[in-house]
Structure formats: structure tokens, C-alpha cells
A protein has these predicted regions:
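Catalytic-loop of the protein kinase fold
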Residues: 186-206
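C-lobe/activation-segment region of protein kinase-like
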Residues: 213-292
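Activation segment signature within eukaryotic-like protein kinase domains
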Residues: 178-179
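A conserved short helix/loop substructure at the end of the activation segment
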Residues: 300-312
Length: 328
């Protein structure tokens, strides 16, 4: 779309559905998004000739940080269509992560997320969107807004209503079916030489309209010395552990409640990344099938063999899936 000049009068008209009109109000208009801290509620961002009304900064809870504000991620209204969109602006950060003895350098890459948005166009298990350059050649991503809750929230809600055994037989089989579809989505990325880069249980949203499990947030990339897909695979393992346990099974909680299995646990039974979480769930819940527990133990501190490819994980998950009765 050709770039247009938007007068203050036109912007007043376009935003009237969402903003109360104030005499003499003037919008701040940005075509260069480099300084994303300056872009605030009620401002206008113009991307490729399309005006967006900025609403709020996105927030995200992670590792106990409730509603951590992400100043480079803006909730907005596409003033052409009236649809809510997420605008991700360019923000660079790096950090190191360790899995066992392997260290990974992680960094944000807008270019990588733009590639993935092109790659996964119309695939149902992925958040959709597109990328565009602003006037300063920043790669901005314009993303659909998915109405729904995270997979983590879904499990927490279930955990307030039933015991684990009831959950495992009544809810887990369907959750496993959807999880496998998500893993198939990651396999698709890997088959095309790409990685998700930040696989977490709160990076799967359950679409309120379709019930579809959908991956979000593809901007992290990983520098690797060994298996380029290893970081994604460990993320998938952590999610599976959470799903199978109806939440994290934490050693300190077991000890505090004087759980009968606590004295049977050894160092090899814990999660390879989070050493306070139990990977060997069969020691806690005897009815966990061996086929599932074998998968979980690939992500334990005592593991000697790891998954190299998502296809290996999917094959083992299919075996677990086949052990549950088919729903009518």
C-alpha cells in the first residue's frame, strides 16, 4: 500500500470508535519505531502506509514475574480493518542458557521471526502475522491477536478442580493429542532449518474460538555448538513434564507434604534444567505408563541418551497416544 499522509482530522475520524474526542487533541505520529519507549497509549504508528492506534504495552508473566511489561511489544488497533493487532518492535537482547553441561547463547532476532512468519503462513498451530520495515528499516512484526488463555493457565485451572489420577485419565489424553500437533509444528520448522527458540508452556495459546493450540513468539534464536534443535527439544520436554504432572511436581512440595515417594527419589530423577522439579513421574504416580515415563526420563538429570530430532520424540509420543482409549 502506498504511503499516505494522515492529517490530524483524518486520524480523529479513524480513531473515534476507540478514543473519546478532546478539543485540540493532536496525535503523535511515528514512522520510525527505533525509540519504542517514546511510543505510548494513544499514539499512531504508520507502517507501510497503514495506521495503527497504540493501546497498551504487552505484559507477560515468567519465572514468578507477574505481568512483566514488554515495552517493545504494543497492543494496537489496525485503523484500516478495526482489528486488534500486536506490533513487535525491534529490541535486541542476549543471554546464556545452560542445559546440563551444554551452554546456549540466546538472542532476539526480528529477521528470524519475519522468516518464520512467512514460512508458517496459514498453518493452524501457529500465530499468524507479517513483517514490514518502518522508515528507519527496522523489521516490525504485525501479529494477529489470539483470544484465549495459555496452556499453562489451562492446566492450572484444571488442577483446582480434580485430583491427578482423574486428570490423567479424563483430560490428559486430549491434551496429549493437541500437544503432539504442536510438536508436529516444531518438526515442520526444523525440517525447514528453523527453530522456535523459546519453547515454553506459556508460549502455547489455546484459541478460544477454535480450541486450537497455537505457538506464539518466534523471535529468539540460539547459537549452538552441538545439535541445533536441542534447545527446542528440551523446551518440548519441559512442557510434556508439566502436562503429565498436571503442573510442576516440585521436590520441596513433596517433602513438605511428607509424600510417601519422597525417600525413593534420587538425584537422577530430577529435571535436567530445573533441579527442584521431578522428571521421573512414575515414582510419584504409579499409573503413569512406562512408555510416557521413558520419554520424560530423556529430560532428567540421569539421562544418558537425548532426542536429536523431533521425529524421534513424535514416534515415542505416538506410542503413548495409542495406549489411551480413543475418544468417541
Amino acid at each position: 500500500m502506498a504511503s499516505l499522509d494522515f492529517s490530524q482530522e483524518l486520524l480523529q475520524e479513524l480513531t473515534s470508535k476507540w478514543l473519546s474526542q478532546k478539543p485540540g487533541q493532536r496525535f503523535k505520529v511515528y514512522k520510525d519505531t527505533t525509540d519504542f519507549f517514546r511510543i505510548e497509549y494513544g499514539d499512531i504508528v504508520i507502517l507501510d502506509g497503514n495506521p495503527f492506534l497504540i493501546r497498551h504495552n504487552a505484559k507477560e508473566g515468567r519465572f514468578g514475574l507477574d505481568d512483566e511489561e514488554k515495552f517493545w511489544v504494543k497492543r494496537s488497533i489496525d485503523l484500516r480493518s478495526g482489528m486488534t493487532k500486536i506490533i513487535k518492535l525491534v529490541f535486541h537482547e542476549t543471554f546464556n542458557a545452560r542445559i546440563g553441561e551444554i551452554e546456549f547463547e540466546c538472542f532476539r532476532s526480528p529477521r528470524k521471526e519475519a522468516r518464520i512468519l512467512n514460512l508458517i503462513k496459514d498453518l493452524p498451530n501457529f500465530m499468524q502475522g507479517y513483517s514490514v520495515q518502518d522508515d528507519h528499516e527496522n523489521i516490525v512484526r504485525v501479529l494477529e491477536f489470539i483470544y484465549g488463555i495459555s496452556l499453562a493457565e489451562h492446566i492450572r485451572e484444571i488442577a483446582t478442580t480434580m485430583k491427578h489420577e482423574a486428570y490423567f485419565y479424563q483430560c490428559f489424553p486430549k491434551i496429549l493429542d493437541n500437544y503432539i500437533l504442536c510438536v508436529e509444528g516444531i518438526r515442520f520448522l526444523h525440517d525447514h532449518g528453523e527453530k522456535h527458540g523459546d519453547i515454553r508452556r506459556d508460549h502455547i495459546l489455546i484459541d478460544r474460538e477454535s480450541g486450537q493450540y497455537r505457538w506464539i513468539d518466534y523471535d529468539y534464536n540460539v547459537r549452538h555448538r552441538e545439535n541445533m534443535y536441542g534447545y527446542d527439544l528440551f523446551g518440548l520436554g519441559n512442557i510434556l513434564m508439566y502436562l503429565a504432572g498436571m503442573g510442576d511436581i516440585v521436590y520441596q512440595d513433596l517433602k513438605r507434604s511428607d509424600h510417601p515417594s519422597v525417600d525413593k527419589l534420587i538425584e537422577d530423577d530430577v529435571n535436567i534444567v530445573f533441579h527442584n522439579r521431578i522428571a521421573n513421574l512414575k515414582k510419584i504416580y504409579f499409573y503413569i505408563p512406562d512408555s510416557l515415563n521413558r520419554i520424560l526420563m530423556h529430560f532428567s538429570k540421569g539421562a544418558h541418551v537425548f532426542y536429536d530430532y523431533t521425529t524421534q520424540l513424535i514416534d515415542d509420543l505416538r506410542e503413548v497416544q495409542s495406549s489411551f482409549p480413543k475418544s468417541a
